[in-house]
Amino acid sequence: MPSTEFSHIELSFGSFDALRAVHFARRFPPHFHDTFAIGVVEEGSCVIRTRRGEWMARPGSVLAFSPGEVHAAIPCDEQGYTYRMIYPSVEAMQELGGAFRGVFAFCAPVIDDERLSGPLREAQVPLMGEGAAVYAESLFVAALRQLGGFRVPADRRAERAAADARIVAIAHEHMAARLSDSVKLDDVAALCGVSPFHLIRIFHRAVGVTPIAYCIQLRVLRAQAMLAEGSAVADAAYACGFSDQSHLTRAFRDVVGVPPGRYLRSVQHRA
């Protein structure tokens, strides 16, 4: 039976969300998180797409995304795939030390290495409340530190050009400050000193989505933060610039994987 369950993890170096999806058969459109997203595929398979390329994720594959990395996931068949994900913040990962300091990406969003996937899954099961959690944190920390060996320093990646980075930063700051308002592409482009068409090209090249799609995902992440603090779904929708609750629900599922109401219930359950 397909199911998707959120839980919350409290560890000595931070607190963060965790997700287990069983027979997830829905296509994830391109999206990003403002946290790391790290997990393991347990059953089935899917195709992972990022601006770096395309990968096949199978049972035992580790999924690893840096904050802001746009990615899409497509199930390979109607049975879907079963996976676990944990979403540690940048601050939480930096508490682990050297391997996670500075700007970097993982060598690939899909890593096939049993030495990594075994310990990571062994740690995730008790962390998500399915077994004794006495030793879970040490297992998880050891697995994450091992994952640090698969990172690629920023200067070894095909990074966006300096001019593109400046334009994206200006656009991000403008949109992030106006999530409750109507954001128009022409206004953002004018602020950045480029044409709307050029701005779209820059965002596709540097980020992987259009400026408006990027803005919608910023709104979803803000709504998610509001729900985590106990706000009602309708209040979060209004405050984050969605036309109504159903508009938020559609966008929220595309980024988070579950409807906002279910996410809110998971927050209330752990309170």
Residue ranges and their predicted role:
Residues M1-P2, A154-A158, Q268-H269:
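N-terminal intrinsically disordered/low-complexity leader segments
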Residues A142, R270-A271:
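C-terminal regulatory/oligomerization modules of transcriptional regulators
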Residues V41, M175-L179, M226-G230:
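Short helix-to-turn junction characteristic of helix-turn-helix DNA-binding domains
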Residues P2-F104:
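N-terminal regulatory/effector-sensing and dimerization cores
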Residues E173-A176, D181-L218, A237-S266:
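Basic/polar phosphate-binding segments, predominantly the helix-turn-helix DNA-binding elements
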